[in-house]
């Protein structure tokens, strides 16, 4: 809606970048393919993609943040740990800050999750379970993060009119 591009056209154009993100679990490794997809298929200016995509690969870790929040609450519930509302708010704020600092590489969220798990008072054994399922979750989360970066490019294309 904001980017004035049909969702079908958008997803068809970005499919190579989304699949690469899913397969590599790396926002950073997907930067060249992401730029190519939105520049060639969707007509976004290089001036926009040169800033938006690398910045998004670095700080746009929204899916990782959501995933870590759910995982903390899941493990707390599984371990019969009562997490108060005030602790949830603290974990949420720390999660937002940690997700911005999470590197866009495979397994980059493991250290952030360890910090959050410690804050929530989870036992150390939770880390083994988290690490064992992290790759499966990371594939989807990275794909969502990259799609968000590319959607931002399309929206900026419509909102910022550049003279080429």
Language-model segments: what does each one mean?
Residues 12-15, 19, 23, 137, ...:
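Membrane-interacting alpha-helical segments
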Residues 1-10:
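Signature of multi-pass transmembrane helix bundles
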Residues 16-99, 153, 164:
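Helix-loop-helix junctions within the multi-pass membrane cores of secondary transporters/permeases
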Residues 6-7, 24, 102-103:
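A short, ordered amphipathic alpha-helix with a cationic face
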Residues 1-2, 41, 78, 119:
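Alpha-helical structural context
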Residues 69-164:
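Transmembrane alpha-helical segments and their short flanking loops
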């Amino acid at each position: 809606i904001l980017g004035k591009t049909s969702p079908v056209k958008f997803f068809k154009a970005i499919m190579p970048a989304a699949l690469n993100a899913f397969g590599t679990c790396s926002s950073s490794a997907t930067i060249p393919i992401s730029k190519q997809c939105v520049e060639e298929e969707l007509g976004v200016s290089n001036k926009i993609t040169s800033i938006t995509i690398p910045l998004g690969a670095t700080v746009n870790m929204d899916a990782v943040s959501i995933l870590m929040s759910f995982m903390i609450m899941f493990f707390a519930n599984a371990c019969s740990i009562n997490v108060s509302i005030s602790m949830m708010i603290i974990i949420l704020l720390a999660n937002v800050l940690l997700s911005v600092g999470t590197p866009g590489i495979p397994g980059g969220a493991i250290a952030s999750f360890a910090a959050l798990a410690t804050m929530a008072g989870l036992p150390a054994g939770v880390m083994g379970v988290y690490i064992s399922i992290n790759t499966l979750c990371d594939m989807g989360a990275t794909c969502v993060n990259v799609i968000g970066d590319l959607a931002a490019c399309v929206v900026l294309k419509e909102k910022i009119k550049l003279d080429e």
